[in-house]
Amino acid sequence: MSMNLIGITSPGVASAIAAAGGRLAGVETQSVEAAGLVALLFRSKDTSWQFLRRSRTALESMVRAQRILEAAAMFGPLLPARPGSLIRDDLEACTLLCGHSRQLAESLRLHGNTTQFQVTITWNPMAALAARRDHPDLAAAAAAGARGAAKEAGHLISRFMADERVAFEAEAMRALATVARDVIALPVDQADMLMNAAVLLAPGAEPDLEHALEALDGSLPGENRIRLIGPLPPVSFAAVSIDRPSRDRVAAARRLLGVREATERHDLRRAYLDIARAHHPDTGAHAAGAQAVGAAAEAFRLLARIAEARLCAEQGDVLLVDILRHDQHRSVST
């Protein structure tokens, strides 16, 4: 049975979790230590989230994962894994830690002490209109309604409310940016929601965030609700993302570069440069050459990373690791 990767932490934090009973949010965890780092894991029968889609099981898994992350963060620095990241066994966990120890340790140092909050702000549109009834645009809408021009009145009100939403969201994002290390705008998926964002905070910055939200609440007339979810480890800003390149994908990259399986990195680079030179504009290559060079560069990066990872994983699948933001996506071959 595969294990879910919670995140990467230090031996000290892992020991503290174990001393407290080894359970996070009621879930039994285990740890694998190697290269001065620890992979925190828990066993789960759930299928990976990418297959669960929008099912109720997926939602329950997401809520449970969030609670586990919240509980883990209470013990100390943690570099979270992208939700749904699976590790097959202890050996693969060791491969992950040993093969990417420098990258993981540096990311843990940079991001492990940061915290993430989700901020949502909703309003009552009718209360917002009532609080702004003296605004010139709404006065014009009232006048239009009084003379029977209901369509014009509705248009004026809709435009006013849309402008207010856009202006407030921009103001809110600016306010959050002044107190946060980073801000990611999240989808606004409810009719009464004005904004939805994830904010990354440095240690001790929570009071600054609270003050900024109080100021925003005061600037927005009507009935408003500000919801703050967290703290969490920085899962939207610095999540461990694991990739296992398929055989077909690797074979396609080798064919594109014209190299064999055991090709060294310097030979991979030479193969890529040969393609780049052949498609250089000075050689009279067509515009499509840029696309060919881009594909060759992607293939080179993939095969070079695999060659490096193979130094630590002589058996089993190769693991490629990136530390990604929520709004970042791994390229086709990296």
Which role fits each region the language model picked out?
Residues 1-225, 231-245, 250, 320-334:
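An interfacial alpha-helical scaffold signature
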Residues 223, 238-287, 295-334:
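N-terminal J-domain/J-like co-chaperone modules of DnaJ/Hsp40 proteins
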